[in-house]
Amino acid sequence: MAQSSNSTHEPLEVLKEETVNRHRAIVSVMEELEAVDWYDQRVDASTDPELTAILAHNRDEEKEHAAMTLEWLRRNDAKWAEHLRTYLFTEGPITAIEAADTAGEGSGGDAAKGATAQGDGSLGIGSLKGEAALARPPRL
């Protein structure tokens, strides 16, 4: 996989800066996920409890790195953002969400049986504006 970070399919001179940066991010995610897989295997194979704990900790750090880079991709690529909003943090069959989304039934496909997603990027908590004012004691 190291070769992926040193090579592009097209000459660098013809690529936009944002394309090169996305390439860096994508390769980083690939490397982080590969490291997660390696650490998973080492955790399974280790017979020493302390080493197992260290390896599991290291694996989880790699997951954090992958998540951070995915967030960068979401913030810097509208199509990534659209797809991540459709599929992440939903319930129900993923393929049903995809079918509902491609049928034009909205982001996350609430029409998909059991699916829940907020197409507006919200966590579904709702607004707390005005509620703080109600909870405050009157000024004297």
Swiss-Prot record:
GO molecular function terms attached to this record: ferroxidase activity; metal ion binding
Free-text cofactor note: Binds a di-iron center symmetrically between each dimer. Fe(2+), Zn(2+) and Co(2+) but not Fe(3+), Ca(2+), Mg(2+) or Mn(2+) induce protein oligomerization. Binds 1 Ca cation symmetrically between each dimer in what is called the entry site; in vivo this may be an Fe cation.
Keyword tags: Calcium, Encapsulin nanocompartment, Ion transport, Iron, Iron storage, Iron transport, Metal-binding, Oxidoreductase, Transport
Means of activity regulation: Ferroxidase activity inhibited by Zn(2+). Mutants at Glu-31, Glu-34 and Trp-38 are also inhibited by Zn(2+).
Residues that, per the record, bind Ca(2+): E31, E34
Cofactor: Fe(2+); Ca(2+)
Broad class of the protein's primary localization: other
Annotated compartments: Encapsulin nanocompartment
Residue sites binding Fe cation 2 per the record: E32, E62, H65
Keyword Protein transport on entry: no
Record region (Disordered): 100-140
SUPFAM superfamilies: Ferritin-like
Positions of region (Targeting peptide): 100-140
Binding annotation for Fe cation 1: E32, E62, H65
GO CC terms of this entry: encapsulin nanocompartment
Reactions catalysed, as given in the entry: 4 Fe(2+) + O2 + 4 H(+) = 4 Fe(3+) + 2 H2O
UniProt KW Calcium keyword: yes
InterPro entries: EncFtn-like, Ferrit_encaps, Ferritin-like_SF
Biological process according to GO: intracellular iron ion homeostasis; iron ion transport
Domain notes: The decamer has negatively charged patches on its exterior, and a negatively charged tunnel at the center, that are probably metal-binding sites.
Quaternary structure note: Monomers form antiparallel dimers which assemble in a decameric ring 7 nm in diameter and 4.5 nm thick with a central channel (construct without targeting peptide). Growth in Fe(2+)-rich medium induces oligomerization, the monomer does not bind metals. The target peptide probably extends away from the ring, to allow binding to the interior of the encapsulin nanocompartment shell.
Family: Belongs to the ferritin-like superfamily. EncFtn family.
Record's function text: Cargo protein of a type 1 encapsulin nanocompartment. A ferritin-like ferroxidase that mineralizes iron inside the encapsulin nanocompartment. Converts Fe(2+) to Fe(3+) that is released to the exterior of the decameric complex for deposition in the encapsulin nanocompartment. In solution the decamer binds 10-15 iron cations; in the encapsulin nanocompartment the decamer can bind up to 48 ions, perhaps via its internal channel and on its exterior.
Protein name, per record: Encapsulated ferritin-like protein
Encoding gene (name): fer
